[in-house]
Structures are given as structure tokens and as C-alpha cells.
Amino acid sequence: MFQGASSLNLDAKGRMTIPSRHRDALLLQCEGRVTLTKHPHGCLLFFPRPVWESHREQIAAWPMSARAWQRIFLGNASDVEMDGAGRILIAPELRSAVGMTRDVMLLGMGSHFEIWDATKLAESEAAAVANGMPDVLNDFSF
């Protein structure tokens, strides 16, 4: 399970170095083979390949009424492999689709990650706080 936030920088080629605390787990779980795809909330989803394959099968089975959503998730999916330096290449099309600049945030979300442009994540979190807690969290406490 992946958790935690990491502030990272993309290099000039659009590569992101995976933090060492996640790199070893990804090598064990999927030999560094991962899939990236676009999310409509303005981030990229980053899955270990076996996790993505399960989701891909579910998405492909959606009815024709969800065809536009299949295009978003499946049509933008990009299989990549971690290189020997622990980096993944984020395709220019994906970076552009979510407005990703050099400064990014990698968020562990359990079975997968989200990759956000750092500024967009801050804006998204501020908007969430401004909108208040959703009702589903009324009975939740730490």
C-alpha cells in the first residue's frame, strides 16, 4: 500500500524520480512496470501494472453509455517502465493534458498514486477545504 506525499521535480525530458521508499515496492510488485493515465480532476493516475490491468478490464466492460469515460481512462493510458535510476518518463501529451509543470507532487493513495502539478494540488486542496467536509465524513474522527 502506498501512502504519503513527495515533492518532486521533473527533469528536462519529463522524467520523475520515484522516491526510494516506493521504488523497492514497485520493483517487487511489478518489476518497475507501471501505467499512467489521465484523471478528469486534473491529475495523473499512476498504477503498478497488475493493478492497472484489473482496472483496465473493468473499464473495458463498461456499457456504451460510458464510452466517453473509457476514452478518458483507456485512451490516455501509457505503459512505462522505471529505468535503472528509478525514473519514469511522463509523456508530453499526459503532462500537457493536466497542465503539469516542473514541480509535482506524488501522492500515495493505497493501491496507486496520483501525480499532481504542485500548484494545481494546492488549489484543489484549498477548494476542498473551502467547500467544507462532505456528509460522508460526519461520523469520521481520528
Curated annotation (Swiss-Prot):
Keyword Cytoplasm in annotation: yes
Family per record: Belongs to the MraZ family.
Leader sequence segment: none
Covalent S-S links between cysteines: none
Any one GO molecular-function label of the UniProt entry: DNA-binding transcription factor activity
Transmembrane segments: none
Organism taxonomic ancestry: Bacteria, Pseudomonadati, Pseudomonadota, Betaproteobacteria, Burkholderiales
Record keywords: Cytoplasm, DNA-binding, Repeat, Transcription, Transcription regulation
Quaternary context: Forms oligomers.
Database matches in SUPFAM superfamilies: AbrB/MazE/MraZ-like
Principal localisation: cytoplasm
One GO cellular component term: nucleoid
GO-annotated biological processes: negative regulation of DNA-templated transcription initiation
Sequence ranges assigned to domain SpoVT-AbrB in this UniProt record: 5-51, 77-120
Source organism (scientific name): Janthinobacterium sp. (strain Marseille)
Database matches in PROSITE patterns: SPOVT_ABRB
Pfam families in the record: MraZ (PF02381)
Name of encoding gene: mraZ
Subcellular location: Cytoplasm, Nucleoid
Protein name, entry field: Transcriptional regulator MraZ
Domain of life of the native organism: Bacteria
